Amino acid sequence: MTPAPFRIDVLGTAHLHAYKALRDEALRCAPEAFTSDHASAVLRPAQSYAERFGAPATGTFFLGAFAADGQLLGSIGCEREARLQQRHCASVVGMMVAPHAQRGGVGRALVQACVQLAEQVAGLEQLVLTVTAANTHVVRLYERAGFRAWGLLPRAVVIQSIGHDKLHMVRWLPASPLFSAA
């Protein structure tokens, strides 16, 4: 099966309502994948996400995968640390793909585009993220993009008394002295 064509673009304020709808659905369908909860998120106005979008050159940005008809299929964020001594780090956050678009290459394309933009940010040396450890498909997706596990936080998210572990991962960027293309 060939996935439908899609394009990756930087999210801006024109995408706020589509982003909120995608996020609310992702929180409803896969609550263990996020630290935010659906009940709280649905109460947030779309405009409250505007400050997260930023601009790629700053190291804080969100990307979207768009279908040919303009529908938002998925998104991923990169949030650079604001503190001076951690400005070399950014967190990959909010990776989500609409259920009907999963396993069609959207997630892989979003991660690749995020890494490529992050590599262009002056002084940015590493990307870090957490992923639900039991979500092995997504863990493998990040590993294929060059991320490596460095720790596990047991019961990082607890939903109805059930704990979900989070795997901590890092990917060194070319600006880092620890970067190795091998």
Name these PLM-found stretches:
Residues 87, 105, 137:
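Residues that form or flank phosphate/diphosphate-binding pockets in enzymes
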Residues 5-7:
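Extreme N-terminal starter segment of soluble prokaryotic enzymes
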Residues 13-14, 20-21, 26-94, 98-100, ...:
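Acetyl-CoA-dependent GNAT
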Residues 111, 118-130:
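Conserved GNAT acetyl-CoA-binding A-motif
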Residues 74, 105-107, 146:
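Conserved phosphate-binding and hydrolysis motifs of nucleotide-dependent enzymes
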Residues 98-100, 104, 133-134:
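Active-site acidic-Proline motif in GNAT/NAT acetyltransferases
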Residues 125-139, 144-182:
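C-terminal "cap" of GNAT-fold acetyltransferases
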